[in-house]
């Protein structure tokens, strides 16, 4: 799934992927113990970005409590710079699925499968085996029947059973939960492909039934990664959606080595090691194409399993937790958070976007600082609202796509700190990347004057008229904008159209792009103004069904997942945000929907890649998004801590939220 930047991250602007989006975090039953194993959700789940905060003051780091005597000692101190919106997992996936809420969320869910990092290998979590073949029920439905490992328990001592999966799905369906719940547990109907039933065959066998023959996207990287929560605890609150989302979560049972400790809204949050936990220990061995896991701590079920290709070079590490307390301290902004880091108040800063290059270079000269640089599995983008004029007009969107000179901004303004990205797929996923077509290809390499002329031609060919089409003087000068513009139906574009983007304090890259793109649209005769806006404000405006027609343009980002099925989540018409999904532009193309259905049914990766490229070709032409850039993920940590690995696509924040379950604090 994906996530708003990011796995545990910005609003599934953090598909952590497949519905596995980053939007969703680590759903492994080993949750914060074997954090190298995490399920996606998006993640697909919404999407790359860390919310910008304006209200929370910088604070003094929280005072750590004494760890439980029977557990590990030591405190792992992390900084955050936007306030989590909930500690309730149901609420998090429903309407508050931003990265900051995800970072601090306790391990309240389990999943059948998980994802092993840093190699992104599909593994079991609660399931005792990977079930990859469905059964045709002969009535238009298909089922996957999965055995669950017996012996796992929630922290309140109740057993993790198949009933938790059956009840969770029933709750999502009966209470009509929205947001990422629609992605991780898509409810099937006569009109929509999805899950139609989840049944506990017995306490340790669950049967998941679809109204189509679900492939990789729908099963292995979809429902098999979806969260299940404790029926014993949450059942008392599941009377209606509002009651469930408002239910207290500070004592909610977890499948993790940590439980909530101190929760001081607007200041700090802490986890404490649970001395009664079974979720600790074990050895993980990572291969380029496979993972081995051995676990026998005398308390949890003994496990010795391998997945994928376990040949070639490898490395192994012991699993934690190795600390007694995990501390999240809230600071007012990035600058305050990294100042605290420089002063030794925190060990690591959770930042879905990574450090700015100049600060990274500055910190590289500091004593006691370790540096990490990884490729990003995400993107920054601008969205058009296709439900209202002028975003509803294809020629308008294409003209904007043509006039925007991303390479100019990247190289001349941003000094090369970002990397151009045209399509939906990160360049690192070479087999998934489609060739650039349409206006982006036609306008590539053109001068400013040529781009302006081409954009005007696109408008004219699309039926637009103007009293005066203006002109471009050549060179770097601004164009004389057209006047009296009217769309193909004679409609005059609105005045003072706002382009919402995070401010420079939160993300100077998107802030800079918003200023240039607003100016380029003005040169085409459109009254567009860049409006710096807090991250959470943008999210509320564009991802809330009742506001789906109340904006023109916005910029956010997505952290993507382990399986790149995010185009279906972001652009299939049945995922429209007006109906609670992640299709914020309101893109509606029957041909795309048909390809999305084929993609969801694909059972071979090669087939999924071919279909994905056809979907991308439509997006290049219709342009619901103008994809902007991606960036390297730059991170730093203090040398008093150590991680089992640091080389991982999307970085330590994006894949493991700082890996609190495996970090070691050196005394």
PLM region spans:
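N-terminal lobe/hinge region of extracytoplasmic solute-binding protein
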Residues: 77-139, 253, 414
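Structural transition elements
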Residues: 420-483, 502-512, 603-605
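Aromatic- and charge-enriched surface segment that lines or borders ligand/interaction sites
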Residues: 130-179, 207-209, 390-392, 397-399
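Long beta-strand-rich cores associated with HINT superfamily self-processing modules
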Residues: 574-575, 635-667
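Ligand/substrate-recognition segments at binding pockets and active sites
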Residues: 78, 265-267, 332-333, 446, ...
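Gly/Pro-rich hinge or "lid" segments in bacterial periplasmic/extracellular proteins
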Residues: 106, 116-121, 224-327, 335, ...
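Extracellular/periplasmic solute-recognition and catalytic clefts
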Residues: 172-186, 261-272, 306, 312-316, ...
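Surface-exposed binding/hinge segments that line
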Residues: 70, 77, 145, 182-247, ...
């Amino acid at each position: 799934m994906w996530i708003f930047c990011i796995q545990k991250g910005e609003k599934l602007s953090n598909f952590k992927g497949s519905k596995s989006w980053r939007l969703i975090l680590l759903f492994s039953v080993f949750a914060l113990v074997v954090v190298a194993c995490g399920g996606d959700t998006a993640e697909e789940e919404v999407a790359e970005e860390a919310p910008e905060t304006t209200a929370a003051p910088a604070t003094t780091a929280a005072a750590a409590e004494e760890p439980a005597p029977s557990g590990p000692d030591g405190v792992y101190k992390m900084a955050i710079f936007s306030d989590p919106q909930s500690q309730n997992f149901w609420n998090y996936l429903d309407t508050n699925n931003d990265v900051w809420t995800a970072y601090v969320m306790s391990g309240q869910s389990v999943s059948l499968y998980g994802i092993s990092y840093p190699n992104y290998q599909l593994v079991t979590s609660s399931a005792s085996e990977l079930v990859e073949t469905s059964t045709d029920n002969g009535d238009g439905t298909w089922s996957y029947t999965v055995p669950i490992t017996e012996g796992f328990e929630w922290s309140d001592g109740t057993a993790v059973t198949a009933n938790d999966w059956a009840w969770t799905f029933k709750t999502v369906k009966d209470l009509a939960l929205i947001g990422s719940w629609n992605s991780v547990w898509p409810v099937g109907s006569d009109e929509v492909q999805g899950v139609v039933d989840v049944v506990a065959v017995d306490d340790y066998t669950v049967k998941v039934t679809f109204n189509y023959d679900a492939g990789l996207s729908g099963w292995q990287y979809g429902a098999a990664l979806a969260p299940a929560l404790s029926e014993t605890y949450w059942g008392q609150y599941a009377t209606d959606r509002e009651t469930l989302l408002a239910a207290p979560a500070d004592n909610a049972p977890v499948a993790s080595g940590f439980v909530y400790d101190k929760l001081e809204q607007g200041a700090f949050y802490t986890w404490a090691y649970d001395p009664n936990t079974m979720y600790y220990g074990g050895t993980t061995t990572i291969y380029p194409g496979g993972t081995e896991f051995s676990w026998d701590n005398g308390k949890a079920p003994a496990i010795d399993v391998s997945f994928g290709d376990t040949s070639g070079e490898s490395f192994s590490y012991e699993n934690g937790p190795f600390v007694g307390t995990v501390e999240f301290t809230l600071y007012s902004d990035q600058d305050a958070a990294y100042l605290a880091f420089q002063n030794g108040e925190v060990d690591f800063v959770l930042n879905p976007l990574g450090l700015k290059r100049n600060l990274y270079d500055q910190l590289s000269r500091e004593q006691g600082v370790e540096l990490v640089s990884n490729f990003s599995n995400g993107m920054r983008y601008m969205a058009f609202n296709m439900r209202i004029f002028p975003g509803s007009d294809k020629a308008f969107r294409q003209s904007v796509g043509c006039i925007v000179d991303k390479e100019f901004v990247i190289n001349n303004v941003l000094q090369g700190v970002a990397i151009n990205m045209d399509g939906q797929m990160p360049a690192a996923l070479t087999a998934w990347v489609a060739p650039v077509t349409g206006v982006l290809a036609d306008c590539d390499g053109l001068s400013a004057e040529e781009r302006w002329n081409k954009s005007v031609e696109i408008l004219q060919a699309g039926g637009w008229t103007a009293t005066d089409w203006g002109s471009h003087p050549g060179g770097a000068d601004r164009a004389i904008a057209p006047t009296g513009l009217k769309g193909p139906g004679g409609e005059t574009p609105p005045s003072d159209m706002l382009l919402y983007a995070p401010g420079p304090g939160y993300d100077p890259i998107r802030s800079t792009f918003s200023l240039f793109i607003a100016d380029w649209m003005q040169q085409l005769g459109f009254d567009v103004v860049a409006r710096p806006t807090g991250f959470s404000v943008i999210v509320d405006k564009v991802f809330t069904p009742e506001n789906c027609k109340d904006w023109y343009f916005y910029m956010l980002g997505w952290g993507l997942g382990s399986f790149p099925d995010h185009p279906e989540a972001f652009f299939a018409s049945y995922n429209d945000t007006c109906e609670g999904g992640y299709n914020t532009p309101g893109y509606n193309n029957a041909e795309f929907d048909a390809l999305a259905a084929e993609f969801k049914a694909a059972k071979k990766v090669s087939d999924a890649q071919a279909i994905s490229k056809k979907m991308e070709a439509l997006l290049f032409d219709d342009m619901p998004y103008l994809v902007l850039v991606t960036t390297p993920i730059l991170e730093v940590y203090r040398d008093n801590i150590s991680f089992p690995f640091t080389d991982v696509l999307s970085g330590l924040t994006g894949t493991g939220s700082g890996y609190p379950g495996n970090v070691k604090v050196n005394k």
